[in-house]
Amino acid sequence: MSPPVFIDTHCHLDATEFDTDRSAVHSRTRAAGVALCVIPAVEVANFEAVRLLAHAQQDAYALGIHPLYTPQATEAHLAQLDAALHAHRHDPRLVAVGEIGLDGFVPELNTPEAWAKQQFFYKAQLKLAQRHQLPVIVHVRRSADGLLKGLRDTPVVGGIAHAFNGSLQQAQAFIALGFKLGFGGALTYDRALQLRRLATELPLSAIVLETDAPDIPPHWLYTTAEQRAAGEPQGRNEPAELPRIA
């Protein structure tokens, strides 16, 4: 029997954490049986970086404005996103609009003004995804209901709910809209009882795997606050960890 082939559906391989050994990370990724990585952009400034990296590594990419970057985003950036999606519309490595969405966790993003701006950019990017007939990769952090409302108002051709950690009812609502749910390193923690139970309640066809590298390290890479205070760095996640996470 052939070994399984994996796809890391969400990893930020353009991040500075990989600047010193990006080629080695890529080699380990392929050696581990991860045949493809999807590299989402987070702001206009890294659109070209993720595109070039995806081509250099024979991976895939997505273009979008992450909710954490909406405070400094402008309508001109939306025009640049629209132009980039049009310019690369025949590029088979461009697979989605993302990472977009809503973040209900970061306090400074949840003032009335900041939340309204998040909503504006989320809805505008859904319209771009609709226009360009692309799926979306959505950031879901304490925001599932708001994301679902946007998707019902502006239907798109499916996508992935990245790092999903909502309820079974919310999961089923995303699935009904043509979405897959992304699971990764968070599942590896013994305390993640609710998330593990949710994963067992979903059909396998609704689940995709991801690392969110360099973030969301699995338990074997995690260092505690005490360890970090003592000088140990936080473990860096990378796509080669995906088979063990699975």
Which ranges hold each PLM region?
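Mid-domain alpha/beta scaffold segments of enzyme catalytic cores
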Residues: M1-A246
